[in-house]
Design a protein with these regions (language model features):
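N-terminal periplasmic accessory domains that precede
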Residues: 78-82, 109-116, 139-142, 161-167, ...
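C-terminal beta-signal and adjacent terminal beta-strands/loops
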Residues: 617, 657, 668-669, 722-738, ...
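Transmembrane beta-barrel wall of Gram-negative outer-membrane proteins
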Residues: 247-276, 281-317, 340-358, 441, ...
Length: 809
């Protein structure tokens, strides 16, 4: 934010290339204001700022040096820009430094497009700058600089992303609103928010994370927003090819190939990604195919229309979970040879953007999903509830044939939605401001069916009702969902340093559950004596308002203080309620969760020497849903009570070269620290032995540190993470003794530490990347699964190697 008096000012001009000709599609930014524009076909730009003052004007396009200039303006100003072409022989260190300066590492602007981020805790991952195992979506490396994240690791090559934070269950990132290029990608935003699809890191330019205050603009989730921003088409090129071929341990193979370019007003980006591996445990191989296409038509400098389509299919074998005893004896052991998981995902979106002026913008999108997921496996004898679902053998007869059939769960997802946003800058009675008004309509109709699968070993996802009519885990449900929301935020610039951003969100949610389940009774000899089909139809209709308030205060030219309080709400995921499992039961009286998120912090505005963000937070969680265990080792999911989670989050990235005042343009040496101290307690609960206990999924210390280094075309990264122990259930249970049916299901996750080392070397159009994940070969686990891919302990991947060859033309 500049230092200003109240007036309306236009900054305009023409951008020229190295030959003195007007240059189109150059990004023009006025730093720290959120004001930006792309030059038109005549190279012209025109930006308006609400206040006079000192600003930094930035112009950037690929292949040219960044133009940066401090300007002091008090009236309309004309500034022409002459770009200087980059040398073809620049080293990788210099190129990455250029990108860092353009994108202002680690922060979202106050306003970006039709979105407001003022006063919100947010973080941005610049994926191109990561030196790590992007071929396998290694979450430890990709998300290493996002504070306080708790990551589930399953050794599945990054097919699914499971992250949480601040006491939120990491399972499939279900406590975040997950989006791709701004639209929803989960099976059902309210009824089934789990993320089965995760874009490959090689296709991403940014990963944007906005914490709990994102509830007002994006949805009511406590975790906030994760937005995967895909690479954009290469400007100034008709065709750009990037081919990345990777190999690694456990017969890992990845082939990522993309094409992009701009032809006249049409630009495009498309890729195909194939990935496969045998897995680090027996019976844990997978194959994945993913394709994506983005087309954008730029009618003029003010109006564009884009279409994108995503397809994903993968088949993964699952090794099953372990008991604590099994893990201690052999952490890569597998006693499940015929468990499978399959995904088929189709996403499409149409996005329209129009700038009425430099002050007023409109965006409208339509998106939809058609998808399926199937899980098949043996998880213990469903009739004998007194046996261990983790340790029980998958029995065979004397001929070597399996005795029991497998359990099959099939889900079909159909949803579509629209989102409309209008953002405008204005001036009212001498006070500048920015307002955002938006609306979203979302409708889904999903089905979930559970029943007897085949008795074989292959990935056969067909039900076998005729052979097993009395299979106890049978259900067939349809889940229609309807959601309408209206939201708004407004930035009031009180003076040159202080801004206030109130906001609201109105939600109307109508959820239905229509279906039947089988109630099967057995005698002592496990023979069926009764099989009754029970009808279970429910409907939930609710409307409510959420409010929030954000504050931001500029502290000199290099830092900003921010504060935010926001209401949050999380709908019960009804599509899971009637899924029957030998070890998983849902309380029929379960209700929605609600609460508040508060952030207070200070962060850097410039990143030349030190990029930092230090904050404290609080999260009040009422009617928090958790899991208790009954005396048969069944996990019962229900509303546990009121929980309070609080802590401090510290991030710092120090550029040692800059701090030493050395003019070493060919050298990179950065050290980062990423630390979260978190405490928690259940304040109230109707359950015995819960009040006063710590909230599950919260390590008291979540510490990550590392060094990123480089010399000319050689880049490197070494990082180390440590998480203290964390509980996995609301009663803070200790590990069950050997022989107890709950062994592997209850108990804390022990503290663990992991180290990763990666290198990258660039030469002209080629790049070689290589590294070692889990350098010290630490045996540890991050998860006790309640169901698939377990139940039980899911070991994390042992030491592995990878090498990637990239060719770019």
């Amino acid at each position: 934010m500049g230092y200003f008096s109240w007036s309306q000012i236009e900054v305009s001009g023409i951008v020229y290339n190295e030959k003195g000709r007007p240059k189109e599609r150059v990004e023009i930014h006025i730093q720290s204001t959120g004001v930006n524009q792309m030059t038109d076909g005549s190279g012209r730009y025109g930006l308006e700022v609400a206040e006079a003052g000192i600003y930094k004007l930035i112009a950037f396009t690929y292949g040219y040096q960044i133009f940066e200039k401090l300007i002091q303006i008090s009236s309309d100003t004309l500034i022409d820009i002459a770009l200087v072409k980059l040398s073809q022989d620049l080293s990788e260190v210099v190129i990455l430094d250029q990108k860092q300066r353009v994108f202002n590492l680690g922060r979202l602007n106050t306003v970006e497009g039709t979105r407001i981020y003022a006063g919100k805790k947010n973080e941005v991952i610049l994926v191109d700058q990561i030196v790590g195992n992007k071929a396998s979506n290694n979450a430890r490396q990709v998300y290493s600089q996002i504070v306080g994240l708790n990551i589930y690791e399953s050794g599945d090559g990054g097919l699914q992303l499971s992250i949480g934070g601040r006491g939120l269950d990491p399972n499939r990132s279900a406590n975040f609103n997950t989006r791709q290029n701004g639209y929803d990608i989960s099976p059902d935003v309210l009824g089934y928010p789990e993320s089965y699809y995760t874009p490959p890191a090689e296709a991403l330019s940014q990963i944007q994370v906005v914490r709990g205050a994102a509830a007002l603009q994006y949805g009511t989730q406590f975790g906030g927003l994760i937005n995967f921003k895909m690479h954009q088409p290469a400007p100034g090129k008709k065709l750009e090819l990037i081919a990345r071929q990777s190999v690694g341990s456990f017969n890992f193979l990845s082939s990522f190939n993309s094409l992009s370019g701009t032809v006249g007003k049409l630009s495009y980006y498309t890729y195909f990604h194939h990935k496969q591996s045998d897995g680090f445990r027996p019976n844990s191989g997978y194959k994945s195919n993913n394709t994506f296409t983005y087309l954008n038509y730029q009618f003029n400098s003010e109006t564009s229309l884009s279409f994108e389509y995503t397809y994903l299919n993968y088949l993964a074998q699952q090794s099953g979970g372990l008991t604590d005893t099994q893990f201690d004896l052999d952490p890569i052991y597998s006693n499940r040879t015929r468990n499978w998981f399959e995904i088929d995902w189709n996403l499409a979106a149409l996005n329209f953007n129009h700038n009425f002026s430099s002050k007023t913008k409109l965006s409208a999108m339509i998106f939809g999903l058609v998808a399926e997921r199937n899980s098949l496996g043996y998880r213990g004898n469903p009739i004998n509830l007194n046996s261990s679902p983790v340790a029980e053998d998958d029995y065979k007869d004397q001929n070597g044939d399996f005795i029991y059939n497998r359990d099959l769960i099939a889900g079909v997802f159909r949803n579509y939605g629209t989102e409309l946003r209008l953002l405008s800058r204005y001036k009212l009675k001498g006070t500048a401001g920015v307002f955002l008004l938006g609306t979203k309509f979302y409708k889904s109709r999903n089905t979930a069916k559970q029943g007897p699968g085949s008795i074989g070993i292959d990935a056969n996802f067909n039900f076998n009702y005729e052979r097993y009519p009395d299979y106890p885990n049978q259900s067939d449900f349809t889940f229609p969902n309807l959601n309408f929301s209206l939201f708004g935020e407004n930035i009031f610039f009180i003076n040159e340093k202080f801004a206030v951003t109130p906001g609201f969100r109105f939600e109307h949610i109508f959820t239905e559950s229509e279906g039947v389940y089988s109630e099967v009774l057995f005698d002592i000899a496990q023979n069926p004596i009764s099989n009754v089909e029970q009808i279970d139809d429910r409907s939930f209709n609710r409307s409510f308002m959420l409010f929030g308030l954000g504050l931001s205060h500029t502290i000199g030219p290099k830092a900003e203080g921010y504060a935010n309080i926001s209401q949050n709400y999380r709908s019960v995921t009804f599509s899971d309620i009637r899924t029957v499992s030998p070890t998983f039961i849902v309380d029929p009286d379960i209700t929605d969760e609600q609460g508040y998120t508060v952030d207070l912090g200070i962060r850097s505005l410039t990143t030349k020497t030190l990029n930092f963000d230090v904050s404290i937070f609080g999260l009040l969680y009422d009617d928090r849903i958790g899991i208790i265990l009954d005396d048969r080792a069944n996990r019962v999911r229900k509303n546990i009570g009121e929980a309070f989670i609080y802590g401090m989050e510290i991030f710092g990235d120090l550029n040692l070269v800059s701090s030493l005042n050395k003019d070493w343009k060919e050298v990179k040496l950065n050290v980062f620290i990423n630390t979260a101290f978190t405490e928690s307690s259940y304040l109230a609960s109707e359950e015995n032995n819960v009040k006063g206990k710590k909230v599950e999924f919260i390590p008291m210390l979540n510490f990550k540190t590392g060094v990123n280094f480089g010399f000319r075309n050689l880049m490197g990264s070494l990082q180390w993470i440590y998480l203290s122990e964390q509980f996995t259930d609301v009663e803070n249970s200790t590990i069950a003794v050997d022989g107890d049916n709950r062994n592997g299901l209850i108990g804390e996750i022990p503290s663990y530490h992991v180290m990763d080392l990666s290198f990258a070397y660039s030469f002209k159009n080629f790049k070689i990347e290589s590294g070692i994940n889990n350098l010290m070969n630490t045996f540890y686990f991050t998860r006790r699964a309640t169901s698939y891919p377990g139940p039980g302990i899911i070991p994390s991947e042992s030491r592995s190697f990878y090498t990637t060859l990239q060719v770019k033309f």
